[in-house]
Amino acid sequence: MKRPDYRTLQALDAVIRERGFERAAQKLCITQSAVSQRIKQLENMFGQPLLVRTVPPRPTEQGQKLLALLRQVELLEEEWLGDEQTGSTPLLLSLAVNADSLATWLLPALAPVLADSPIRLNLQVEDETRTQERLRRGEVVGAVSIQHQALPSCLVDKLGALDYLFVASKPFAERYFPNGVTRSSLLKAPAVAFDHLDDMHQAFLQQNFDLPPGSVPCHIVNSSEAFVQLARQGTTCCMIPHLQIEQELESGELINLTPGLLQRRMLYWHRFAPESRMMRKVTDALLEYGHKVLRQD
Protein backbone atom coordinates (compact mmCIF):
# COMPACT_ATOMS: atom_id res chain seq x y z
CA MET A 1 0.00 0.00 0.00
CA LYS A 2 1.41 3.39 -1.00
CA ARG A 3 1.66 5.82 1.91
CA PRO A 4 2.49 9.38 0.84
CA ASP A 5 4.88 11.54 2.82
CA TYR A 6 2.74 14.45 4.00
CA ARG A 7 5.64 16.86 3.59
CA THR A 8 5.59 16.13 -0.14
CA LEU A 9 1.80 16.40 -0.17
CA GLN A 10 2.09 19.88 1.33
CA ALA A 11 4.26 20.86 -1.63
CA LEU A 12 1.51 19.77 -4.02
CA ASP A 13 -1.03 21.64 -1.94
CA ALA A 14 1.09 24.81 -1.93
CA VAL A 15 1.46 24.80 -5.72
CA ILE A 16 -2.33 24.65 -6.10
CA ARG A 17 -3.08 27.19 -3.35
CA GLU A 18 -0.41 29.66 -4.47
CA ARG A 19 -1.18 29.10 -8.16
CA GLY A 20 2.40 28.34 -9.15
CA PHE A 21 5.78 26.86 -8.18
CA GLU A 22 7.54 30.13 -7.38
CA ARG A 23 5.00 31.35 -4.83
CA ALA A 24 4.70 27.83 -3.40
CA ALA A 25 8.45 27.82 -2.77
CA GLN A 26 8.21 31.18 -1.00
CA LYS A 27 5.32 29.91 1.11
CA LEU A 28 7.23 26.77 2.16
CA CYS A 29 10.55 28.63 2.58
CA ILE A 30 12.34 26.25 0.23
CA THR A 31 13.69 26.55 -3.30
CA GLN A 32 11.53 26.20 -6.38
CA SER A 33 13.66 23.21 -7.36
CA ALA A 34 12.88 21.54 -4.03
CA VAL A 35 9.15 21.99 -4.64
CA SER A 36 9.49 20.36 -8.06
CA GLN A 37 11.51 17.48 -6.59
CA ARG A 38 8.92 16.76 -3.89
CA ILE A 39 6.09 16.67 -6.41
CA LYS A 40 8.16 14.46 -8.70
CA GLN A 41 8.70 12.07 -5.78
CA LEU A 42 4.94 11.84 -5.31
CA GLU A 43 4.35 11.28 -9.01
CA ASN A 44 6.99 8.54 -9.09
CA MET A 45 5.40 6.91 -6.05
CA PHE A 46 1.96 6.77 -7.67
CA GLY A 47 3.21 6.19 -11.19
CA GLN A 48 1.17 8.99 -12.74
CA PRO A 49 1.03 12.80 -13.00
CA LEU A 50 -0.53 14.61 -10.07
CA LEU A 51 -0.40 18.09 -11.61
CA VAL A 52 -1.50 19.47 -14.94
CA ARG A 53 1.24 22.01 -15.52
CA THR A 54 -0.94 24.79 -16.87
CA VAL A 55 -1.04 28.41 -15.69
CA PRO A 56 -2.17 28.19 -12.97
CA PRO A 57 -1.40 24.51 -12.29
CA ARG A 58 -4.33 22.25 -11.46
CA PRO A 59 -4.45 18.78 -9.90
CA THR A 60 -5.19 15.63 -11.85
CA GLU A 61 -7.92 13.30 -10.59
CA GLN A 62 -5.35 11.41 -8.49
CA GLY A 63 -3.95 14.73 -7.28
CA GLN A 64 -7.44 15.75 -6.17
CA LYS A 65 -7.78 12.57 -4.13
CA LEU A 66 -4.44 13.18 -2.42
CA LEU A 67 -5.35 16.79 -1.61
CA ALA A 68 -8.63 15.61 -0.12
CA LEU A 69 -6.66 13.13 2.00
CA LEU A 70 -4.36 15.93 3.17
CA ARG A 71 -7.36 18.05 4.24
CA GLN A 72 -8.70 15.18 6.33
CA VAL A 73 -5.32 14.50 7.93
CA GLU A 74 -4.89 18.17 8.87
CA LEU A 75 -8.28 18.24 10.56
CA LEU A 76 -7.70 14.97 12.38
CA GLU A 77 -4.30 16.22 13.59
CA GLU A 78 -6.12 19.10 15.23
CA GLU A 79 -8.43 16.57 16.87
CA TRP A 80 -5.59 14.45 18.26
CA LEU A 81 -3.16 17.17 19.29
CA GLY A 82 -5.72 18.94 21.44
CA ASP A 83 -6.19 22.54 22.50
CA GLU A 84 -2.83 22.98 24.24
CA GLN A 85 -0.78 22.51 21.07
CA THR A 86 -3.19 23.91 18.47
CA GLY A 87 -4.44 26.98 20.31
CA SER A 88 -1.41 29.10 19.42
CA THR A 89 -1.83 28.56 15.68
CA PRO A 90 -5.36 29.11 14.34
CA LEU A 91 -6.59 26.22 12.22
CA LEU A 92 -7.26 27.11 8.58
CA LEU A 93 -10.72 26.00 7.42
CA SER A 94 -11.34 26.32 3.69
CA LEU A 95 -15.05 26.25 2.83
CA ALA A 96 -16.82 26.60 -0.52
CA VAL A 97 -19.95 28.74 -0.23
CA ASN A 98 -22.38 30.41 -2.59
CA ALA A 99 -22.49 34.20 -2.67
CA ASP A 100 -26.13 34.46 -1.58
CA SER A 101 -25.53 32.39 1.56
CA LEU A 102 -22.50 34.52 2.35
CA ALA A 103 -24.59 37.69 1.93
CA THR A 104 -27.43 36.47 4.15
CA TRP A 105 -27.18 33.74 6.77
CA LEU A 106 -23.72 32.13 6.71
CA LEU A 107 -21.66 34.66 8.69
CA PRO A 108 -24.20 34.99 11.53
CA ALA A 109 -24.31 31.20 11.67
CA LEU A 110 -20.53 30.99 12.08
CA ALA A 111 -20.26 33.89 14.55
CA PRO A 112 -20.34 31.71 17.72
CA VAL A 113 -17.63 29.39 16.35
CA LEU A 114 -15.41 32.29 15.31
CA ALA A 115 -15.79 33.87 18.75
CA ASP A 116 -14.90 30.72 20.69
CA SER A 117 -12.47 28.80 18.48
CA PRO A 118 -8.95 29.48 17.12
CA ILE A 119 -9.73 29.18 13.40
CA ARG A 120 -9.06 31.16 10.23
CA LEU A 121 -11.67 30.98 7.51
CA ASN A 122 -10.84 30.76 3.83
CA LEU A 123 -14.24 31.20 2.18
CA GLN A 124 -14.14 30.35 -1.51
CA VAL A 125 -17.17 31.83 -3.28
CA GLU A 126 -18.66 29.67 -6.01
CA ASP A 127 -22.10 29.06 -7.48
CA GLU A 128 -24.09 26.60 -5.38
CA THR A 129 -24.24 24.23 -8.35
CA ARG A 130 -20.43 24.00 -8.39
CA THR A 131 -19.28 24.22 -4.75
CA GLN A 132 -19.32 20.44 -4.31
CA GLU A 133 -16.69 20.14 -7.04
CA ARG A 134 -14.25 22.08 -4.86
CA LEU A 135 -14.76 19.51 -2.12
CA ARG A 136 -14.26 16.71 -4.63
CA ARG A 137 -10.98 18.30 -5.76
CA GLY A 138 -9.73 18.60 -2.19
CA GLU A 139 -9.63 22.40 -2.31
CA VAL A 140 -11.94 22.76 0.71
CA VAL A 141 -13.07 20.72 3.71
CA GLY A 142 -16.74 21.72 3.52
CA ALA A 143 -19.20 23.06 0.97
CA VAL A 144 -22.69 24.59 0.84
CA SER A 145 -24.29 23.06 -2.25
CA ILE A 146 -27.62 22.29 -3.92
CA GLN A 147 -26.42 18.71 -4.46
CA HIS A 148 -28.18 16.35 -2.04
CA GLN A 149 -25.99 13.30 -2.64
CA ALA A 150 -22.82 12.93 -0.58
CA LEU A 151 -19.48 12.31 -2.26
CA PRO A 152 -17.56 9.15 -1.30
CA SER A 153 -16.07 9.46 2.22
CA CYS A 154 -18.18 12.56 2.89
CA LEU A 155 -21.22 13.48 4.99
CA VAL A 156 -24.21 15.61 3.99
CA ASP A 157 -27.07 17.31 5.89
CA LYS A 158 -29.94 19.46 4.68
CA LEU A 159 -29.65 23.11 5.68
CA GLY A 160 -32.88 24.49 4.22
CA ALA A 161 -33.95 26.54 1.24
CA LEU A 162 -33.47 30.09 0.01
CA ASP A 163 -36.56 31.47 -1.74
CA TYR A 164 -35.75 33.82 -4.61
CA LEU A 165 -38.19 36.54 -5.67
CA PHE A 166 -38.29 38.40 -8.98
CA VAL A 167 -38.02 42.02 -7.86
CA ALA A 168 -37.36 45.57 -9.05
CA SER A 169 -37.91 49.14 -7.96
CA LYS A 170 -41.30 50.73 -8.53
CA PRO A 171 -39.96 53.17 -11.19
CA PHE A 172 -38.37 50.24 -13.05
CA ALA A 173 -41.66 48.32 -12.97
CA GLU A 174 -43.58 51.35 -14.25
CA ARG A 175 -41.13 51.80 -17.11
CA TYR A 176 -40.74 48.20 -18.29
CA PHE A 177 -43.91 46.52 -17.03
CA PRO A 178 -46.70 49.15 -17.25
CA ASN A 179 -49.20 46.40 -18.14
CA GLY A 180 -47.69 43.74 -15.90
CA VAL A 181 -44.91 41.22 -16.44
CA THR A 182 -45.40 39.57 -19.82
CA ARG A 183 -43.28 37.55 -22.18
CA SER A 184 -42.85 40.49 -24.55
CA SER A 185 -42.07 43.04 -21.83
CA LEU A 186 -39.40 40.78 -20.31
CA LEU A 187 -37.48 40.80 -23.59
CA LYS A 188 -36.73 44.51 -23.08
CA ALA A 189 -36.10 44.56 -19.32
CA PRO A 190 -32.40 44.51 -18.26
CA ALA A 191 -31.52 41.70 -15.87
CA VAL A 192 -28.37 40.62 -14.02
CA ALA A 193 -26.47 37.36 -13.44
CA PHE A 194 -23.60 36.55 -11.09
CA ASP A 195 -21.47 35.07 -13.88
CA HIS A 196 -21.84 33.44 -17.28
CA LEU A 197 -22.80 30.12 -15.68
CA ASP A 198 -25.48 31.60 -13.39
CA ASP A 199 -28.81 30.35 -14.75
CA MET A 200 -31.14 31.46 -11.94
CA HIS A 201 -32.81 34.31 -13.87
CA GLN A 202 -32.95 32.40 -17.15
CA ALA A 203 -34.41 29.29 -15.50
CA PHE A 204 -37.14 31.34 -13.82
CA LEU A 205 -38.13 33.05 -17.07
CA GLN A 206 -38.04 29.84 -19.06
CA GLN A 207 -40.12 27.96 -16.51
CA ASN A 208 -42.77 30.64 -16.03
CA PHE A 209 -42.76 32.61 -19.30
CA ASP A 210 -41.35 30.11 -21.82
CA LEU A 211 -38.42 32.40 -22.67
CA PRO A 212 -35.38 30.52 -24.01
CA PRO A 213 -31.95 31.07 -22.41
CA GLY A 214 -30.11 34.13 -23.70
CA SER A 215 -33.22 35.96 -24.83
CA VAL A 216 -33.09 38.81 -22.29
CA PRO A 217 -30.37 41.49 -21.88
CA CYS A 218 -28.25 40.60 -18.87
CA HIS A 219 -25.48 42.34 -16.91
CA ILE A 220 -22.76 40.22 -15.27
CA VAL A 221 -21.95 41.31 -11.71
CA ASN A 222 -20.04 39.08 -9.25
CA SER A 223 -21.69 40.36 -6.08
CA SER A 224 -24.92 39.43 -4.31
CA GLU A 225 -24.96 42.78 -2.52
CA ALA A 226 -24.65 44.56 -5.87
CA PHE A 227 -27.81 42.81 -7.09
CA VAL A 228 -29.74 44.59 -4.36
CA GLN A 229 -28.13 47.93 -5.19
CA LEU A 230 -28.85 47.54 -8.91
CA ALA A 231 -32.49 46.75 -8.18
CA ARG A 232 -32.88 49.60 -5.70
CA GLN A 233 -31.47 52.19 -8.09
CA GLY A 234 -33.77 51.05 -10.90
CA THR A 235 -31.11 49.58 -13.17
CA THR A 236 -32.29 45.97 -13.39
CA CYS A 237 -34.86 43.43 -12.35
CA CYS A 238 -33.30 40.60 -10.31
CA MET A 239 -33.79 37.25 -8.67
CA ILE A 240 -32.84 37.94 -5.04
CA PRO A 241 -33.30 35.82 -1.88
CA HIS A 242 -36.31 36.97 0.12
CA LEU A 243 -34.13 36.74 3.23
CA GLN A 244 -31.82 39.40 1.79
CA ILE A 245 -34.47 42.04 0.99
CA GLU A 246 -37.10 41.76 3.71
CA GLN A 247 -36.70 45.42 4.72
CA GLU A 248 -36.75 46.70 1.12
CA LEU A 249 -39.95 44.78 0.41
CA GLU A 250 -41.60 45.98 3.61
CA SER A 251 -40.72 49.62 2.89
CA GLY A 252 -41.79 49.39 -0.76
CA GLU A 253 -38.32 50.26 -2.03
CA LEU A 254 -38.47 46.99 -3.95
CA ILE A 255 -41.58 45.19 -5.19
CA ASN A 256 -42.25 41.56 -6.01
CA LEU A 257 -42.96 41.60 -9.75
CA THR A 258 -44.54 38.14 -9.85
CA PRO A 259 -46.49 37.45 -6.62
CA GLY A 260 -47.08 33.75 -6.20
CA LEU A 261 -44.03 32.80 -8.25
CA LEU A 262 -40.61 32.09 -6.78
CA GLN A 263 -37.48 30.02 -7.33
CA ARG A 264 -36.54 27.75 -4.42
CA ARG A 265 -32.99 26.48 -3.92
CA MET A 266 -32.55 23.78 -1.28
CA LEU A 267 -29.08 23.89 0.28
CA TYR A 268 -27.02 21.07 1.78
CA TRP A 269 -23.88 21.03 3.92
CA HIS A 270 -21.17 18.64 2.70
CA ARG A 271 -17.92 17.79 4.51
CA PHE A 272 -15.35 15.05 4.84
CA ALA A 273 -15.90 12.07 7.13
CA PRO A 274 -14.93 11.49 9.83
CA GLU A 275 -15.44 14.99 11.21
CA SER A 276 -12.88 16.55 13.49
CA ARG A 277 -14.01 18.25 16.67
CA MET A 278 -13.66 21.68 15.04
CA MET A 279 -15.63 20.69 11.96
CA ARG A 280 -18.33 19.26 14.21
CA LYS A 281 -18.64 22.70 15.81
CA VAL A 282 -18.95 24.28 12.37
CA THR A 283 -21.54 21.71 11.32
CA ASP A 284 -23.62 22.20 14.47
CA ALA A 285 -23.55 25.98 14.07
CA LEU A 286 -24.56 25.89 10.39
CA LEU A 287 -27.36 23.40 10.93
CA GLU A 288 -28.76 25.14 14.00
CA TYR A 289 -28.84 28.57 12.35
CA GLY A 290 -29.84 27.28 8.93
CA HIS A 291 -32.83 25.46 10.39
CA LYS A 292 -33.94 28.72 12.01
CA VAL A 293 -33.76 31.08 9.03
CA LEU A 294 -34.02 28.88 5.91
CA ARG A 295 -37.21 27.27 4.61
CA GLN A 296 -37.59 23.72 5.88
CA ASP A 297 -40.65 22.54 3.92
Swiss-Prot record:
Ranges of the DNA-binding region feature: 21-40
Presence of the UniProt keyword DNA-binding in the record: yes
PROSITE patterns: HTH_LYSR
Keywords: DNA-binding, Transcription, Transcription regulation
Residue ranges occupied by any HTH lysR-type domain in the UniProt entry: 4-60
Disulfide bond residue pairs: none
Protein's UniProt keywords contain Transcription regulation: yes
SUPFAM superfamilies reported in the protein's UniProt record: Periplasmic binding protein-like II, Winged helix' DNA-binding domain
Alphabetized GO MF terms: DNA binding; DNA-binding transcription factor activity
UniProt-listed InterPro entries: ArgP, ArgP_gammaproteobact, LTTR, LysR_subst-bd, Tscrpt_reg_HTH_LysR, WH-like_DNA-bd_sf, WH_DNA-bd_sf
Role of this protein: Controls the transcription of genes involved in arginine and lysine metabolism.
Family: Belongs to the LysR transcriptional regulatory family.
Oligomer and partners: Homodimer.
Name listed for the protein in its UniProt record: HTH-type transcriptional regulator ArgP
Originating organism: Salmonella arizonae (strain ATCC BAA-731 / CDC346-86 / RSK2980)
Gene: argP
